[in-house]
Amino acid sequence: MRYWMMNSRIFSLLAHTLLAVAASVFSASVFAHPHGIMQCGLSVHFQDGRPHTVAGRLLMDHPHSSQALALLRDTASGQIDAGRQQRFLFTLKLQMARINWLLNAAAEGQALNLVGTSEPTLFLANDGRFGVNVDLRVDHETATTPDVVWKFSCQDPSWYWVSEFIQPESPVIVTGCAHPTLSPAVKVATGPLAGSVHVDVQCASTDRK
């Protein structure tokens, strides 16, 4: 099954931002063996057996989160400075414009084209990790037939990050489907996708809701 990149400029930018955070706080080359762990979470809503919307969440590990947040805090108050945050993110996006770190989707050679419905949002998780939320919808002009198996993956072609699902036992939350079929999450150990994780999801037409 062939991998296809989600055609979403917004998602690309937020992914570039997270990878750039790592590049800015660590001196090691981005194009090297893994230096950190990136966790991914997905919520997919189906309509008529097809993916309709996708909500994505990316979480950096604690070491990268701590050093990135230190760059955003006001040295006097200790609070995150809004102006510093905006300048920081803008600079990182420019620096890392050529890095493609994306969540991918594929189904029998057909691309799932996603478009952003809103600007990505930064957040600080309860455990102190730094992350990004994004909401996407399927471009219906490229919608595929129902009943196929969709492969959702989380990977970093630069090999800076090792990818994990936030909840490996239930990597994807599926709604709009009465009885979805999910395969166990798979971690790729070798080859060009080493360090990535993926999961297969299917919503049969007889299960439409």
Language model: regions and residue ranges:
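Bacterial N-terminal signal peptides that target proteins for export
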Residues: Y3-L18
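Short N-terminal segments immediately surrounding and downstream of signal-peptide cleavage
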Residues: F31-R50
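Short, well-ordered beta-strand segments enriched in hydrophobic/aromatic residues
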Residues: P51-S66, F130-V138
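Acidic, glycine-anchored loop motifs typical of Ca2+
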Residues: L71-A82
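Short, well-structured hydrophobic secondary-structure segments
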Residues: Q85-A106
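Mature, soluble, non-transmembrane domains
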Residues: L102-K209
